[in-house]
Amino acid sequence: MTTEEVLSKLDSDQKGISSTQAKERLSQHGPNQLESPTKPSPLKIFIGKFKDYMVLVLIFAAIISFIAGETTNAYVILGIVVLVAIIGFVQEYKAEKAMEALREMVAPEADVIRDGQMSTIPAADLVPGDVVFLEAGDKVPADGRILEVTSLQVIESSLTGESMPVEKLAQTLPEDIALADRKNMVFMGTIISQGNCRAIVTATGLGTELGRISGLMKQEQAEPPLKIKLQQLAKRQALLVMVISAIVFILMFSRGLPVIDALIASIALAVAGIPEALPFIVTLALAFGTQAMAKKNAIIRRLPEVETLGSTTVICTDKTGTLTTGEMTLREIRTYRKIEVTGAGYDPSGQFISQGAKLEPTEEDLARILKIGVHANNSAIERANGGWRVVGDPTEGALIVAAKKAGILDKIKDSSSRFIEYPFDSERMRMTTVDEVHKEGYIVSMKGAPEVVLSHCTKTTTPNGTKTLTEEDRRSILADADDMAENALRVLALAWKPISNNDPVEVDCIESGLIFAGLTGMMDPPRKEVPEAIRVSKMAGIRTVMITGDHRLTARAIGKELGIGNGEVIEGVQLDRMSSEDLREHIDDVSVFARVTAEHKVRIVEALKARGHIVAMTGDGVNDAPALTAADIGVAMGRTGTEVTKEASDMVIADDNFATIVSAIEEGRRIFDNIRKGTSYLLSVSFAELATIFFAVALGFPLPLLAAQILWINVVAEEFPAIGLALEPSHSDIMKRKPRDPKESMPSRPLMIYTLGIAAAIVAGTLGMYIITLQSNPDLSYARTVAFVGLGFFTVYNAYSSRSLQESVFRMNPLGNKTLLMGIAASILAILAVVYIPFMQFIFETRPLTSESWILIL
């Protein structure tokens, strides 16, 4: 659509609209704002924690305890309930502020032409048809079509993923092009880095690209897998308890036993079958795990997502600022030879190497390239926050950093002064300066697109000086430029010539007869730790998918360098032509996506999830936020990430280090391993208690354990070792295993078989000791004490043997988990206290044990 057609469609012109029209349109379109969602109050968040099924089961256990008259234990259980709720509340209190962060990105004011006059108004009052003026440093207040432009460049990395400032033009473009290629448009929330323009507002508020992203982020997040599995486990356990309790009640009642005895037995069964410590131990494992992650720069914002991270099968990662440094770096120079430049980012440390040998910056061809790069340049490098930053254009900054690496930047600047400048623009495609240089006179320096710079050159550089530039030379140079571009390098050609102070200063004269100096290739380089992180991920069975707004060639080259994918790249326009079914069919075959929008990222994540993957999505820009929300776990970068992305995420990487993600995955696996161990341990004890009571009653024996005794084991004695299991250190093989099946139940079938086997052994031992003691000693309380202590010690043995589900505990370092050892000691003391402290003997109806009974137990 042409500019005239846009103006006509919006019923506007180059002078904008009138104030009257603006009022009418404001009432029609609404304010230029993003919606503010209703946020739950802190009280509602806290109350919501009590709706968890396992918490409801605990509350039921407390009620049962009150009925049984065990008020102390009931209060203990309620205390656990409140503690679990508080921990969950604290973790989630500040969650989901993404919409608020998005609103903060919108410019508060805008310069607009109304009634033919320039005025400044609140950005919220902008309407379609308004003509706005934008200049360097401005935040774009709404989406708009450019009417007039002067050397305009816009930073769109947070919206599109494009790592470089984008040059904008006032021209007609095809309609079916990617968001990142719409160079005649400016978009809300992006920043003008250079030049100025006049643009007509085409969309405001939720109608903008940023507004559409805001809409994408409204989708409900699925429940974390761990939470779902624990709810399913709680339901199964509650059903089992009710069925067995009912059977025992009916069995005892049918035998003519008093109703109160049958009720007490049923209560004991209900208490036995509920692993009261499980929600607390799960929350504790998650909480301590998040603390360990925080020490490694991975900040978890939602506790259950730790388990999700540990079961990740695919990491979808943005390129710019995540896999790469986000800092343009000069990587290669081509004069009559190829020169490699080492180092990365804006840190001015590195070397210049040709054919394996280090070059000195005094060598003529290299020195000339560096001088031109500094002269034809308006950017600077400065110290910032313990590092370095570029002030100005990142591409120019890369040339400045290269001169700093050579140690000649200050010398070049101090020995020269700017005389004339012909700036870069979209039509010229080059920048030319004339500098007065000490001992050299006046020097013309030019940088720009290779084909453009070559058209102004008549000579080229050789090892022996200069020579006439031939057509064969031109073809060779352009072939070199194409080769560099194929390797994801942003290519600039550099040229120069000396002039005298008597030469004409007209631009045509200045920019003719130049000497071609060489080509420079810059790129946003991969972070040095990323290749190893990806290698470890592969070893752990985790696939890495790169999703970027950058160009196909850049994406392919970065993917090849990092070992991502097989060289195949799908672009956003191809995704637009693919149905959801087609995308799901091909999603496992492609690992690199280029020129994508926020909607594309969400589609990719959803396609992977539809194939059964657990998806982690990393990113730092606004364009990543909807996909982070859609993923099973969203991972934001802490330093370079926008507030929008951080608030949409489940985890924030504080150091922007991709390797930290791998470390977090390892920690997530450790945490889930420990939750599995703790679950197996606690369930084996609960099953053993259930079965011991059931079989004793079924065989006609009195209750072997009282409800108070069971509660003491469940809430106190078994909880200390369980805390130790929750803190078991990571084992060496944890990142050599394939990811868990996301559909695996909690506990899994093999783990349940193992758990039932342990429970059977405990039942046989406990019930056997009880029956033997009861037959030799008519004191029922004494026999129950033997059963209580026996069960307690079986619990201790079980805790220690549960340290690993993969290898024998006897092959492990016996002192490898000191917390568990202290927990076991505390558990033994808690058991002995009930047996030997007089007032506790009264409460729990226990008796001191003889040496014969201790021999039987041990």
Segments (PLM) and residue ranges:
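Long hydrophobic segments that form regular secondary structure
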Residues: 766, 770-780
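Generic alpha-helical transmembrane segments
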Residues: 717, 761-763, 785-799
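Conserved cytosolic headpiece of P-type ATPases
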Residues: 1-738, 746-747, 771, 788, ...
